Amino acid sequence: MKRININSQQTHFIGCWNLENNKLCNEIINLFENNKNLQIQGISDKGIDPKTKKTTDIPVSPNDLKKPKFEILKKYIGELHKCFLDYQNQWPFLKSMFNTLYVPSFNIQKYLPGDHFAALHSERTSINTSHRLFAWMTYLNDVDDGGQTNFSHYGIKINPETSKTLIWPAEWTHAHTGEVLKSGTKYIVTGWMHFPTSDEEIKQKK
């Protein structure tokens, strides 16, 4: 992976990289399109509400990564981990305090023209989500018209480009929107990193 600097006049704590293997992104798109039976209407913390979020998703659980069908996503998580290690190098405090985090279930998402995640949102908004520390996302294809990720508190808009990967704090400080896609198709894979919560995860940390 190659680190990308996001130009801003203020510190924003948004890590950005390009993955070296663009083929990986194409294979994840193929996985999505070849599994229509797994696709669901996009859900947010408000449930199914097209005014808040309008996408088509495939949810992926950690156990799914053990199945041959999802081998490509297991490889992807390995690439995401490399990005996180570089993120730690940029902020050494993370190495000493948060050396063990977990990736729970995540989504592959497809956007058609008119689709969006237009509601301003963050990933840590209640006691039920308080264990989330970071959010992450990889754009799986280039998008020419719309579909940017807008971190409005920082005046930062990220254009979707193949393999571009983001990691950012899950807090309200990094509330953002997924702007309306005006033409074409947009694919992403996205999820969270969290503190250990289950008994099994806590034992692994010890």
Model-inferred region functions:
Residues 1-165, 173-206:
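Fe(II)/2-oxoglutarate oxygenase catalytic core
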